[in-house]
Amino acid sequence: MNLHSFNPTNRGINLLWLAAIALLVSGIGFAENSYGAAAEEIDTSANVAMKRFYKQVKGAKEFVRGAKGLLIMPNVKKAAFIIGGEYGEGALRIGGKTVGYYNIVSGSFGLQIGAQAKDIIIAFMTREALDGFRSSQGWEAGVDGNVALITIGAGERVDTRTIKDPIVGFVFDVKGLMADISLKGAKFTKLNK
């Protein structure tokens, strides 16, 4: 390298690319294998996520009864080192029965490092919202439909009378509902399972 042509801007960009490649090569990749989880594994994980949801969120069972469909994305993994990404697979259920499998993919850029897992439940409260999701080739939150994320404090309950949004989301981990979360830009795509 010629010292007279050294450009710190190029070096910074190269370091970002190197970090992104290292993240992918290091095995922090999101899919457990190139085919993803089997349908039975997804259903089992979705059942566990729903049990956790019912336990952590008061009024959740009553709220779910009013939904036309639920997209349950258990154990969505996020990893980041400057460039971040998120991936998970889940089940769309109507009337308590799985009618399809989907993945979630999103990315981010900025000062971030670490890894975490969370569950996401998206409730389609109207037939129109559910049909719009099901008929899309790749549904993007914030573009194809707005997801109203519910954040309630400990001990509070979901009030089915005050929530009027057609699409409602809950993001939680083992500690409970997560605040300051956005699904905007997350893309959901139907899987062939």
Language-model segments: which ranges?
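N-terminal secretory signal peptides that target proteins for export/translocation
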Residues: 1-11
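A ubiquitous, low-specificity "background" feature that marks scattered single residues
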Residues: 8, 16, 20, 150-152, ...
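Intrinsic-disorder-associated interaction segments
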Residues: 9, 13-14, 35
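Bacterial N-terminal signal peptides
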Residues: 15-29
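Small-residue-enriched, tightly packed secondary-structure blocks
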Residues: 34-193
